C-alpha cells in the first residue's frame, strides 16, 4: 500500500487534515483479490481512508496497460468502497499521463492530493 500526504489544509468530518482529493490507485481485482497478499488488511485500510473523504473528493484510478484491449472491462477489488463515479484510467505507470485527469485536477484548482492503493 502506498500512502502519501503533502501540504494538507482541509479538515474532514473528524477534524483530521485531508487533501483536496484522494486518488485511489490500482485497487482492482488484477492486483487485490482473495488469496493475494494482505487482501483483507489492504481493503480495510483503503476503505477507512475513502470514508474519511467527502464522496465528491474521491477519485479512482484503474490501471489498463497500454497493451490491454479497451473493450475488456476492468473490475474494482471485491469489497472496495465505491463512493464516487470519478474514474480515470492510466495506461502507463503515472496516472498523470491521463490528460483528462490532469485537466480535471487543474480545472478544480487542486493544490494537494493524497494517494492510496
What name fits each language-model region?
Residues 2-87:
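Active-site acidic carboxylates
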Residues 1-7, 106, 115:
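Extended hydrophobic/aromatic-rich secondary-structure runs
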Residues 81-117:
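Internal catalytic-core helix/loop-beta-alpha segment
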Amino acid at each position: 500500500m502506498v500512502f502519501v500526504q503533502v501540504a494538507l489544509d482541509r479538515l474532514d468530518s473528524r477534524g483530521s487534515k485531508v487533501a483536496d482529493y484522494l486518488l485511489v490507485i490500482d485497487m482492482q481485482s488484477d492486483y487485490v483479490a482473495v488469496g493475494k497478499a494482505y487482501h483483507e488488511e489492504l481493503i480495510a485500510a483503503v476503505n477507512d481512508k475513502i470514508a474519511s473523504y467527502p464522496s465528491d473528493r474521491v477519485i479512482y484510478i484503474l490501471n489498463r496497460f497500454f497493451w490491454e484491449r479497451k473493450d475488456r472491462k476492468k473490475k474494482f477489488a471485491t469489497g472496495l468502497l465505491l463512493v464516487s463515479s470519478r474514474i480515470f484510467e492510466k495506461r502507463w505507470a503515472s496516472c498523470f499521463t491521463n490528460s483528462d485527469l490532469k485537466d480535471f485536477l487543474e480545472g478544480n484548482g487542486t493544490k494537494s492530493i493524497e494517494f492510496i492503493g
